[in-house]
Amino acid sequence: MSQRPPTRRAAAPAEVPFTRNTLALIYDFDGTLTPQPMQEYTVFPQLGIAPEDFWAEVNAETRLTGGDSILTYMRLLVEKIEANKAHLSRAALRRLASGIRYFPGVETWFERINRYVATRSGGLVQARHYIVSAGLSEILEGISIKHHFERVYASQYHFNHHEVACFPTIVINDTSKTQYLFRINKGRETPGESINEYMPEAQRPIPFGHMVYLGDGLTDVPCMTVTKNYGGFAIAVHNPANPASLEVCRALVAAERIDYFALADYRSGRKLEKRVRTILDVIIARVAFEREKHLFKAEMGAL
């Protein structure tokens, strides 16, 4: 009598891991983390340029030519460097970044936020920090807080074989900033990678609903709008030394561009930290809900 071969059990379906457990805090730089534009701590003192004169010249030429204000300032800065017969290489610009001064509490902010997210989520969620700035990448490469950031996106010069800045290779202005939100959203964080191909929402590593954008003014409106329209959050900060910045924040609230604003004081226990933590709590709850839903679908064999 022939024996029936043993029945083989069907292999259990491979477990699909839950990977959308990252939140992103995305910062403008000038006026958000620092009281003044980065050039005013670095290049201008080196060249003896009066900030108010330089920015007035940029604004006048932009109005006259109808050109892009960021391209205009980058070109004028190269001309000023040449006129002063200065040699500001990439390395020199990085060194000048040591003169940048931050709002109170910025240096300890990132580690505090990381600890809060890890503790509050029981280790489920990790925080990442990004800079998206119209300022100069060559300066931002030298900032003392750079190691806290996953990526730093900023305008950039081409340097010739003499290490002289010749022309811009990357220009980030108010509206082009938004492409970097989609890079973070899709996990295509290297500038050369295309972000135009369709990617299903479920495959995007950092949903917009897990993002917080922090800025200081009207130049941040495109990023604030995109972030909020796609389910994320936006906060504005104002400089206590500049009363006009508070009025800008009030206008942003009235236009529903932001969720909150606060004084640019990043120290522990201050209003900015409390309001950011409130948003982080919402995102952490979202991630927990999404993870449980993922596990439920796995149980149902629906993944």
Residue ranges and their predicted role:
Residues 2-161, 252, 256-260:
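Alpha-helical substrate-recognition element adjacent to the catalytic core
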Residues 101-130, 134-303:
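C-terminal cap/substrate-recognition subdomain and adjoining C-terminal extension
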